[in-house]
Design a protein with these regions (language model features):
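C-terminal edge-of-domain segments
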Residues: 171-189
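RNase III-family endoribonuclease catalytic core
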Residues: 22, 29-141, 151
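Conserved alpha/beta core of the MobA/IspD/sugar-nucleotide pyrophosphorylase nucleotidyltransferase superfamily
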Residues: 1-35
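Pyridoxal 5′-phosphate
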Residues: 160-164
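Glycine-rich, mobile lid/loop segments that gate access to catalytic sites or pores
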Residues: 147
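Generic structural marker for isolated residues within well-ordered, non-membrane alpha-helices
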Residues: 144
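Short acidic capping loops at alpha-helix termini that bridge into adjacent secondary structure
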Residues: 154-157
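Glycine-rich phosphate/pyrophosphate-binding beta-alpha loops
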Residues: 17, 165-166
């Protein structure tokens, strides 16, 4: 092999090489853990619903053991899943009377404490609210701002979308609301 000649090859910054142990540590900052959350609740006659900690005045409420915040429940499940901690029912059973009418912000606080203990943080969240009513776009900024406050993260790292189910099924008949969420976690920097 002593007769081989050396040459320089143009590299790419996106091709991260691992030569030393510190390269692996640096690369781990780019790796994340993902979790998916989903929640669905029925409506009944009432005086409003809560989405992402934001109170929406309307002529119905969400049927639930807690305050029925489907958005926070979905996000909580995605956080718990990504952190390998189980699901919302494991910590906040609907069979336990102490969780009756529970403020869902307390569920998120609990999830954030778990992340802190595991030295993890939320990198970003993406959510989709699925309902016929209320219309989410006129309320989007208020919901985003409340989520930012509750999750202690900038609005720019929270995706909030809404869609209908095209008048199909229980959601399409305006008898229920659902939320699907994806969270990406990473080790704290």
């Amino acid at each position: 092999y002593s007769n081989l000649s050396l040459s320089k090859v143009k590299g790419r910054r996106s091709n991260i090489k691992i030569t030393e142990k510190c390269d692996i540590e640096m690369l781990s900052n780019f790796l994340n853990r993902s979790g998916i959350g989903f929640d669905l609740h029925r409506y009944e006659d009432g005086e409003g619903i809560i989405l992402g900690g934001f109170k929406i005045n309307c002529n119905y409420k969400i049927v639930a053991h807690s305050d029925g915040d489907v958005l926070l429940h979905s996000i909580a499940d995605s956080i718990l899943g990504a952190s390998g901690s189980g699901d919302i029912g494991l910590f906040f059973s609907d069979q336990d009377q102490k969780n009756k009418n529970l403020d869902s912000q307390k569920i998120i606080d609990y999830c954030l404490d778990i992340l802190d203990k595991k030295n993890l943080e939320i990198f970003n969240i993406d959510t989709t609210i699925i309902c016929e009513y209320p219309k989410i776009n006129p309320l989007r900024e208020q919901i985003l701002n409340k989520l930012s406050e509750i999750l202690k993260m900038p609005v720019s790292k929270i995706g909030l979308k809404a869609t209908t189910s095209e008048q199909i099924g229980i959601i399409g008949e305006n008898k229920a609301i659902a939320v699907q969420s994806l969270v990406n976690l990473r080790e704290k920097l």
